Amino acid sequence: MLLHIALILGCWSVFSEGAETDVAERADGRRPIWNMGHMVNGIWQIDQFVDLGVNSIEFDINFDKNGKPVYTYHGVPCDCFRSCLNWEYFGEFLTALRHRTTPGDKLYKEKLILFVFDMKTNSLYDNQAYQAGVNMATDIFKYYWNNGQNGGRAYFILSIPNLNHYDLIKGFRETITKKGHPELMEKVGYDFSANDNIPDVEKAYGKVGVTDHVWQSDGITNCIARGLSRVKEAVKERDSGGVINKVYIWTIDKFSSTRDALDAGVDGIMTNYPYVLNDVLKEGAYKNKFRMATYEDNPWVTFKA
């Protein structure tokens, strides 16, 4: 009897939270924006970037020859005016993320709500993608989700640099399901990050049955200028009801480029200087149209103005 009541209350809580989220989004009417700290590969940088004003961070995952994620690291070259050499062992980094996204933990950071796992799978053969997904899921389940017991609450994006590595998604999804926690996949989204043609990206998702939870990235290092034509194409596909739910751009560090990206309709801006986006969001032309996303904003729901 007590178990039955607990299950009812648990389900009510989940549906109630979703209803509150929908009401909040309708009530505000501004597009939620994810301020995405770029290349956060050291544990100490997590706190640094949150203190600088991000609600999301991106980090680079390197694999060994067997497709096992080993450490966070970008290496040379990287963005201009940044240190390229910070790194941590993957398990230790995930544990640090869990502490900072678990309510009640002494290290908890309420505003940190989304991660981007920039997976450097180009070092792998195409036929290793599935196993890489299995290995990613195994480590994330253990170190971040605490084996399914009160793990971190953040959403995250598996960002893949190669369209031929779509089976990574399948390996990840099947592993979490086999561990008896398919509900955790509600926290997981996807991105192909190599600036491929949008129709080709959609075909890759189709091969593994992905129809939602999709963020589409576009960008280049801050050392080089890049136009917004592909961003606008992705935004158009998003707004037409296609597989894309959100669009983000990287790496944007200038005030003018930040304004241009917001004008183009992006949902997220990846940056080395979070204060730039935060300052722009306070400007008269933007403060009534955009706001910083919170945990109550579902990152897999396409915003409707």
Curated annotation (Swiss-Prot):
Keywords from the UniProt entry: Cytolysis, Dermonecrotic toxin, Disulfide bond, Hemolysis, Lipid degradation, Lipid metabolism, Lyase, Magnesium, Metal-binding, Secreted, Signal, Toxin, Zymogen
Cofactor: how and how many bound: Binds 1 Mg(2+) ion per subunit.
Tissues expressing the protein: Expressed by the venom gland.
Subcellular location as annotated: Secreted
Signal sequence extent: 1-18
Main location, first listed in the record: secreted
GO cellular component, one term: extracellular region
Catalytic activity: an N-(acyl)-sphingosylphosphocholine = an N-(acyl)-sphingosyl-1,3-cyclic phosphate + choline; an N-(acyl)-sphingosylphosphoethanolamine = an N-(acyl)-sphingosyl-1,3-cyclic phosphate + ethanolamine; a 1-acyl-sn-glycero-3-phosphocholine = a 1-acyl-sn-glycero-2,3-cyclic phosphate + choline; a 1-acyl-sn-glycero-3-phosphoethanolamine = a 1-acyl-sn-glycero-2,3-cyclic phosphate + ethanolamine
EC number: 4.6.1.-
Necessary cofactors: Mg(2+)
A molecular function GO annotation: lyase activity
Pfam families named in the record: GDPD_2
Propeptide: 19-26
Active site, per annotation: H38, H74
Binding site for Mg(2+): E58, D60, D118
UniProt enzyme class: lyase
GO biological process, one term: killing of cells of another organism
Stored InterPro entries: PLC-like_Pdiesterase_TIM-brl
Disulfide bond entries: C78-C84, C80-C223
Function as written in the Swiss-Prot or TrEMBL entry: Dermonecrotic toxins cleave the phosphodiester linkage between the phosphate and headgroup of certain phospholipids (sphingolipid and lysolipid substrates), forming an alcohol (often choline) and a cyclic phosphate. This toxin acts on sphingomyelin (SM) wih high activity. It may also act on ceramide phosphoethanolamine (CPE), lysophosphatidylcholine (LPC) and lysophosphatidylethanolamine (LPE), but not on lysophosphatidylserine (LPS), and lysophosphatidylglycerol (LPG). It acts by transphosphatidylation, releasing exclusively cyclic phosphate products as second products.
Protein family per UniProt: Belongs to the arthropod phospholipase D family. Class II subfamily. Class IIa sub-subfamily.
Name by which UniProt lists this protein: Dermonecrotic toxin LiSicTox-alphaII1
